[in-house]
Amino acid sequence: MGICYSANNMALSTKRVPLHIWVLALTALWIADAGTLTAQQATTAPTSRAATKAENADFTAAADEVLQQMSEITGLKLRTPLKKTLRSRDEIRAYVIQQMDEEKKPAERYAAARSAEAFGLIPKGFDLDSFMIDLLTEQIAGLYDPKAREFYIADWIPVADQRMVMAHELTHALQDQHFQIEAWVKAARPNDDAELARESVLEGSAMAAMIDYLLLGTGRSVQDLPDIDPTILVGDLGSTPALKRAPPFLKDALIFPYFGGLTFSATILKPAGWSGLSAVFAKPPLSTQQILHPALYGSGKVPAQVTLPSMEKLLGADWTKLEDNLMGEFGWKEVLKQFLGEDRAKTLAAAWDGDRYVVYEQKQTKRMVLVARLRLASEDQAARFFGQYSEALEKKHGTRTNLFRRPNFFSFDTPDGGVFLRCVGADCVSFEGASRAVFDGLGKALGWPAAPDVPKEPAADPAKVATQPKTADSLSAAPRF
């Protein structure tokens, strides 16, 4: 769910991702590890500094030179002149705030943050707006603004690193003149997963072009480099104040368009070169699944269209819908990872074939209801998902009573409402925060057989209420609602 202010609309707001300092550092170090650059060429995250007058005078000339080189690398010709500007940290911060306000209204950003809370992706009450402003102000190295058709670079970036920033962002400028990148990304709306896939094409292709720029004169290209495992790189993203306090999901979401997109772009480049990658703009990927598994893009796999019935009548007039969208394979991998770990999450999410989720909020109490329907690749995969996601739900909700389990139905009660998981065929529905009667109404609207009845039992003995021990990690990774 691109990030300026995010990776996924579900969690944040979509805007073309500005180039971050840590991306420069990780990319150069990764290339150095591959034996392509010398240690002197591998940059580290630069510290804040003011540009000298001489550097300002050289900036435009350097940008023009790099722009010509990127045109030659990508095969995209410059059609109209491009504005180029150095920006101070205060100017970058003002730009971030302006873009955030233009992209989504406060109520929309509130809804997106609450939805991320509902999935357990960010802690309850996490100030997402402030965090993203601080992070982007701290980390932006440069950006291309499609609306203004202007390239900005941070004036504190050392001269040695400016050309690396230029290579990435000026690739976007060239792409915009040929493919109108902002309109191209937004054409995927309202499908957040498809929009993130398009963001990943933009960032991944610009990463590939930046690497080819770094490799000029070596006789090598991005096609010659080893595959990237983004999960390894994410572990290096804790060196700055804002990143240190970032929830794991946000770190993953920040890096995915760059390095997930780079893996996809490199796969496309190998047989066809840059003309083949440009053709992706005419036939964009349909989901993050196609970014994660480029062979599925090549085969033309189309995600299943998954729907959910209206919940308004079942919930009542005092509930407001906050979000109604898709998570995609990337989103579900992140949800599962919070509670099951990276390896299990990756395997389970790979069986994704389509999904839909809705989030509702009660006006007075601010309680939430989360309903998610997931289509798996087969009934066997649905059964596997049922077994492991029921475990995830137990980890997510520390205090629970009346736990009830059958082969395809699982439920328990929490202080904030019932939690239900039901699988029928290859479809699974997860329902958190409402009563059994509302869940039964949903099942009826789906045309599913009635779920098993929970046996009547005496009032629970408080001493036997299952309570998961609370730790600092569990409180931040799996907030209760």
Model-derived regions, located:
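Short, compositionally biased low-complexity segments enriched in polar/charged residues
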Residues: 111-146, 312-370, 380, 385-388, ...
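Acidic helix-start/capping segments at beta-turn-to-alpha-helix junctions
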Residues: 79-99, 190-193, 224-233, 283-286
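Auxiliary, metal-adjacent structural segments of Zn-dependent hydrolase domains
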Residues: 61-151, 155-160
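Short pre-active-site segment immediately N-terminal to the catalytic Zn-binding motif
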Residues: 151-167, 194-198
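Post-HExxH zinc-binding segment in Zn-dependent metallohydrolases
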Residues: 66, 176-233
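C-terminal soluble interaction/assembly domains
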Residues: 356-475, 479-481
